[in-house]
Amino acid sequence: NKVNGEERLKSYFSVNVNKRLAFGFNIDYLYGRGYYQNQSTSNFNAGIFASYIGNKYQMQAVYNNFTMKMNENGGIQDDRYITRPEDMAEGKKEYESTTIPVKLEQTSNKNKDFYVYLTHRYRLGFTRETTTVEDAKSPKRAVANDSVPLAKDTIITEEFVPVTSFIHTMKVERARHKFSSAKETEGQYPNAYFNEVASRDSTTAFSVKNVFGIALLEGFNKYAKAGLTAYISHKFNRYELMDTLSRTRFDEQELFVGGELAKRQGKTLHYNVNGEIGIMDK
C-alpha cells in the first residue's frame, strides 16, 4: 500500500570463521506512511558483533545503532473537516484523510542512539593431563569374527585449567533527541525565544563506562567450590541541553567498587551474591 501502508526490511547474518572466532551483523528498517499528511515514521536499527573464545584470551564486542524519525503534523487545522465536512470549501470538495489540511509541515522528532560494548579477559592457569579409555566395542576397533579380545586404548590429552581472570569491560553510548520545524504558523507556541516560525531543539547524553576486575575461578581444584570476583568501575556522563542563550553542559563522575561470590557449577546448589559501594559523588 503506497498510500498508508508499511514496509520492512530485515536481515541477520552470523558465521563462525573457526572454532574460536565468529562475527555477524543485523539490519532492521521499518517505514510507515500514516493516514494523514506529514505523519510518516521510520525506524532503522543496525549492528555488528564479534567474539573470540580462546583458552587464555576471550572477547565479545558489539556495536548497535538506532535511529527513529517521526514526522509531526500538529493535528488537523479544523475538526469540521471530519465532523462537518460539508461546511468546508463550501461543500465543493470531498476530503480524504490524506488531503485534510494539518497544522505543521516539515516538522519532525528524531531520536538517534548508538553504543559500543566490549568485554574481554585474559585467564591464567595450568595445564593438566586427562586420560580417556577407548571402548574396545567402538566401531573403529571392532573386527568381525575375531575371537581374540583386543586391548583398550588409553588416550592422554592436555587441557587448560583457568585459575585467575583479569577482566575489562567498556561501554560507550550516545543518545540524542532533536526536534526541528522549518515551517510553523505565527503564534503556534505561546513563547517564542528565537524564531516565531521555526524551531530547532536538541538534547544529548553521552557516557563512557569502564570496569576492571580480577576473578578467582570456580572449580580449578576440589576446594574451589565457588568463584570470587572483585572489581572497580568508573562512569563518565555528559549532558547537553539548550536554554534561552546557548547550550548548557553538565558532567558527572561515578566510581564504584564491588564484588561477587557465585557458584554456577554442579547440580545441587547454585547462588550468586553481588555487592558494591559508591566512593565518588556525582
What residue spans do the PLM features occupy?
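Transmembrane beta-strand segments that form the barrel wall of outer-membrane beta-barrel proteins
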Residues: N1, F23-Y35, M242-D243, T268-D281
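Outer-membrane beta-barrel translocator/receptor signature
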Residues: N1-Q37, T41-F44
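Residues that define the transmembrane beta-barrel architecture of outer-membrane proteins
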Residues: G5-L9, S42-F44, K110-V116, P162, ...
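Residues on the lipid-exposed face of transmembrane beta-strands in outer-membrane beta-barrel proteins
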Residues: S11-V15, F25, I48-Y52, L118-Y122, ...
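Repeated loop/turn-to-beta-strand initiation elements of outer-membrane beta-barrel proteins
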Residues: R20-F23, K56-A61, F126-T130, R176-H177, ...
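Membrane-embedded beta-strand positions of outer-membrane beta-barrel proteins
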Residues: F25, A50, M59-A61, F166-M170, ...
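Outer-membrane beta-barrel translocator/channel fold
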Residues: G34-N45, F49-K112, K282
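Outer-membrane beta-barrel translocator domains and adjoining extracellular loop/strand segments
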Residues: Y36-S42, E72-D78, T132-D135, F179-T185, ...
